[in-house]
Amino acid sequence: MKYTLTRIDPDAPVERYPQEQRQTVEDPLAQEASRGIMIGRLEEVLQDTVNWGRKNSLWPYNFGISCCYVEMCTAFTSPHDVARFGAEVIRASPRQADFMVIAGTPFIKMAPVIQRLYEQLLEPKWVISMGACANSGGMYDIYSVVQGVDKFLPVDVYIPGCPPRPEAFLQALMLLQDSIGKERRPLSWVVGDQGIYRPQMPAEKDRKRGERINVTNLRTPDEI
């Protein structure tokens, strides 16, 4: 599997945020593990164990901007049982949360606030962009709206829709869990930039393209 190595680039231009340098690499543990090297196998087991704990205990930060936040809150009601994913513990402070959901329209005045809250999240941290407005500005192609939160934040999962259904939010959690399960992070006591390896997951539209092309009987709106 291809991985994206992300490192902090302090010499990057100030107007670029986050100040990261990315490059595509191979799995850093696959080569050592395939050769049967003891240290490589041990590190692979440790990585899988730590990732298992992280992906099954995702604490979201309670933050919403606009109408998509209503659908996000609906996903936390009893019919959807978000506790299955270990994400029912909503945090009131970003310092106690694992990931942040940008649910709503990111206005330019709100962008510095979102960026500040993201910086207060402790590593490891992830971002989900929920809804058309957060993904690309939606129908608000105007001066006061940022055309996508990925202009100033690194986004891990995009949820399409206006607004997305609660089931779409649950699917995004599962996709984020799959991505976290394949991550490679430093297991070290050294404080500082050591690089993060994130898997290059295939887009859902590409993965389901063949299945959707083969659909011949379209359901009516009342059957969906």
From Swiss-Prot:
Using the UniProt annotation, give all residue ranges assigned to the region (Disordered): 202-224
Compositional bias (Basic and acidic residues) spans? Answer: 203-212
Instruction: List where in the cell it is found.
Output: Cell inner membrane
**Top enzyme class of this protein?**
translocase
- What is the organism of origin for this protein? Aeromonas hydrophila subsp. hydrophila (strain ATCC 7966 / DSM 30187 / BCRC 13018 / CCUG 14551 / JCM 1027 / KCTC 2358 / NCIMB 9240 / NCTC 8049)
Query: Which residues hold [4Fe-4S] cluster?
Result: C67, C68, C133, C162
This one is known as NADH-quinone oxidoreductase subunit B
Q: What InterPro entries would the database entry show?
A: NADH_UbQ_OxRdtase-like_20kDa (IPR006137), NADH_UQ_OxRdtase_20Kd_su (IPR006138)
Which cysteines pair up through disulfides? They are none
Its main localization is membrane
What is this organism's lineage?
Answer: Bacteria, Pseudomonadati, Pseudomonadota, Gammaproteobacteria, Aeromonadales
Name the gene that codes for it. Answer: nuoB
